[in-house]
Regions:
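Early extracytoplasmic/domain-onset interaction patches
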Residues: 1-14
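Divalent metal-coordination and catalytic microenvironments
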Residues: 10, 140, 207
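Residue-level detector of beta-strand face positions
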Residues: 11, 26, 89-91, 200, ...
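Asparagine-centered strand-capping/turn motif at beta-strand->loop junctions
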Residues: 11-19, 29
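Hydrophobic beta-strand positions in extracellular immunoglobulin-like domains
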Residues: 11-12, 74, 209
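Extended low-complexity, serine/threonine- and proline-enriched intrinsically disordered segments
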Residues: 23-36
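Zn2+-dependent peptidoglycan hydrolase active-site motif and core
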Residues: 196, 208-250
Length: 250
């Protein structure tokens, strides 16, 4: 789409004794004294926020003592337009104190602006890759271009003691009949009815196959399969090493 994306997640703890509502998040080049690069309004924040523990909220509110995770997918027209470093100004309002609330709740301001979330972007040139499929009728979606949380960007889980966007760069490829705009020919409860079924997959670049799992049973379309251990969460898959620490997983 001609856009360069910077993808990350902001973790914001409300340690105040009053519920908070994020009204804007400014991205600021360099440090807090730099130029404002972009502003996310309250509606955009709400569409991309979930609470720690994996619950999408649909709001920009952070209850007392809870941590919100704001998924950021910032698009830029060129590599040169991306700041080498940037931070954020989170602007939030607090709900009115309640009579039975903590003693210091009434002393908090009604609105605050907090600087945080410092980011250093990579200086590496992004790896150019090819398509993992061939032929016509392929539709790529649920990726970085989504304006709101999707089936991948809301997969925020703890890995190795850190909150991780486990499917941050995932893309869904769906094969459709352009004339009918459908993805199946037959019973949609059967895998073999899907136009993408049994189509060949291609390496997206010169690579080494470093992992193959093919022993798990197929799942029923549009249903979440039973997972006994975390290692089964991905299902059957292939991992390619593209070099330079870059992996591709199918």
């Amino acid at each position: 789409d001609g856009v360069y994306y910077v993808a990350y997640e902001l973790t914001i703890l409300n340690d105040a004794p009053r519920d908070a509502t994020m009204t804007a998040i400014e991205t600021i080049a360099d440090d807090e004294h730099g130029a404002v690069v972009s502003i996310a309004d309250q509606a955009q924040i709400a569409a991309n926020t979930l609470l720690a523990g994996g619950t999408p909220t649909g709001t920009a509110e952070i209850p007392v003592g809870r941590t919100a995770i704001v998924v950021v997918r910032a698009g830029y027209p060129s590599l040169e337009a991306i700041p080498a470093t940037f931070t954020h100004r989170v602007i939030a309002t607090f709900a009115p104190p309640t009579p039975d609330g903590p003693r210091l709740a009434s002393m908090y301001p009604d609105e605050v602006a907090q600087i945080g979330g410092f980011v250093t972007t990579s200086t590496e040139t992004p790896l150019a890759i090819g398509a993992p499929v061939a032929g016509d009728g392929w539709f790529a979606n649920n990726s970085l271009e989504s304006a709101a949380l999707n089936a991948h960007s809301d997969v925020i889980i703890p890995v190795g003691g850190r909150i991780t966007g486990a499917e941050r760069y995932a893309i869904d490829f769906l094969r459709i009949d352009v004339a009918t705009m459908t993805s199946t020919d037959g019973d949609p409860a059967l895998n073999e009815s899907y136009l993408a079924f049994d189509q060949p997959l291609l390496a997206v670049a010169d690579a080494t196959v470093v992992r193959v799992v093919s022993t798990l049973p197929d799942v029923t379309p549009r249903q979440i399969g039973t997972i006994d251990v975390v290692d089964e969460a991905t299902g059957n898959h292939v991992v390619l090493d593209l070099g330079g620490g870059v992996l591709a997983m199918y």
